[in-house]
Each structure stands twice: as C-alpha cells, then as structure tokens.
Amino acid sequence: MDDCIKDRNSWRLWFENQATFVSGKEKLWYERILWEDVVVPLLIGKQDISTKELDPYLERLRRGEPLAYVSGRTYFYGIPFQVGPGVLIPRPETEELVAWILEDHSGERLSILDIGSGSGVIPIVLKKKRPDWKVYAMENSLEAIRIAEKNGQLNQVPIEWIHEDLFATEALRQVPKMDLIVSNPPYIRDSERHNMSTSTLNFEPEEALFVRDHDPLLYYREILKVADAMEASCLYLELNEFLTEIYQEWVAELSGWTALFRSDLQGKTRMLRLQKATA
C-alpha cells in the first residue's frame, strides 16, 4: 500500500525524508510553499492523498526547476501571482522600480503602459495600488499573456492586455496616448550567461532575459520610440548593473529628456527615470 499524506505532520515527515536535495532554511521554505500551494489543494475533498501524486513535484525540483514554477505561485510586492514556464520569475529589484513609480506619482491620475509585461506583476501592482489609473500592458508571448490575464483575474484588477511585438509597427497604433511608460526589458548580454544560475538558464525563457552583446540598448531605443509616439512624459526602466557607462552615454545623447539613475537596496545602479524636459 502506498504511503499517504493526510495532514501537515505526515507531509512534513515525508518531505524531510525525500527532499535530500535541499537543506537548512531553504528546505523549510520549500516544505511550507509546497504544502500551501500543492498539497493543500490536492487534499481538498479528500481524507488523504498518495505520495505518488507528489513524486512528480519533487522530481522537478531535483532537476533544478525553480520552486515558483513547481508550486505555480510566487509573491511580488506582497501580492500572489501565478507563474510557470514561459514567464520570467519576478525579482525583488523590480519591486523597487514599482515603488519608485508609486512614490513619484502619489496624487496623480495617470494612463500607463507596461512594455514586456510577462506575468503581469508590474501593471497589476500599479493598478491595485492606484485603482484610478488606466493601465495597459503589452506582451509578445501568448503564453505570458495567458498567465498575465489569469493574474489580473486573481487579483481582481482590470488591465488592458495587448498582444503585440514591440518591434512591429502596429505596436504604435494599438495604444492611445500615455502619461507614463514602464519596462523591465531583456538586458543581460549573452556574454554574461556565466553570471546566471543554472536553474535560470535551464528553465526561464531566454527571450525575456538576453540581448546580443553588440547591441545591449536594442530594447531601450525601441521603448523610447514608443514613448515618443505615445507622447509619454515619463519613462521608468530597469537596468543591467554592468552597463551603467553605456546607459550614461546613451542618455547624454538624448534630446528633450532629463535622466535620473537610481541604485537598488544593494547599491547597484538598476533603475532609470527619463522625464520630458520642460522649457
């Protein structure tokens, strides 16, 4: 007869014995997240479940798949989000970018476009924190749009989702005039792959991460074109900490925009705000 899980204690004991690939605080974290996001839903309406139902989840973790993908959920800005293969797992640095926007525009009613939304964390948090803002989100990946729409429903916020390629000319006609544009674009150079974790390289979508070495500003230039076309007066961008000089040279050549760089909590230059210069 198969071993069964019927409560938290039986789950904890089984996981402790089976999950030899993690230890210490990380193991405690894995146990809690999997209990909440995997085991509890499987137990609904049942007295117990076979451990055979849980073996595939542990096998995915043994292969190095990120916990957020295996559990199907992560938190961003204290808010739950569904994630899975096909969307980037949101990072804490992006929370700081969102916080900057909220800090700068606390008393305004804005129309906002997020470019490259992925799982939708940026537009959803902005809309949740500022319900009177009109928020649009543009994403090229159909799988990402599907997950983002689910997250909008999960968090009960209306977002205008746009399935569009940033580099397609139609992108400029899909969205009305915007006050503010935000983006966390691909910015990691191919030559920086050695800095990435094996888990990230093997499982997260590389199209959301990497840009060619010879043109690291590719997405930033295109986003700026959209900002100009949408007559946006403010632009917030997440940055590659290793490209500060390249960004500084780029903004020095921009006409009509003033730039402000900001460091993250680790002291790394990770954010940029561009504002239309006033006469």
Model-identified regions with their sequence ranges:
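A short N-terminal interaction module
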Residues: 2-54
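A general structural signal for well-ordered alpha-helical segments in protein cores
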Residues: 12, 27, 31, 54, ...
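Proline-centered flexible-loop/turn and helix-kink motifs
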Residues: 20-24, 131, 157, 205, ...
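Conserved AdoMet
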Residues: 32-103
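Conserved SAM/SAH cofactor-binding pocket of Class I
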Residues: 96-195, 222
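Mobile active-site "lid"/loop adjacent to the S-adenosyl-L-methionine
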Residues: 187-218
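Conserved Class I SAM-dependent methyltransferase catalytic core
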Residues: 213-274
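Flexible, glycine-/basic-rich loop-and-beta segments that form/coincide
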Residues: 278-279
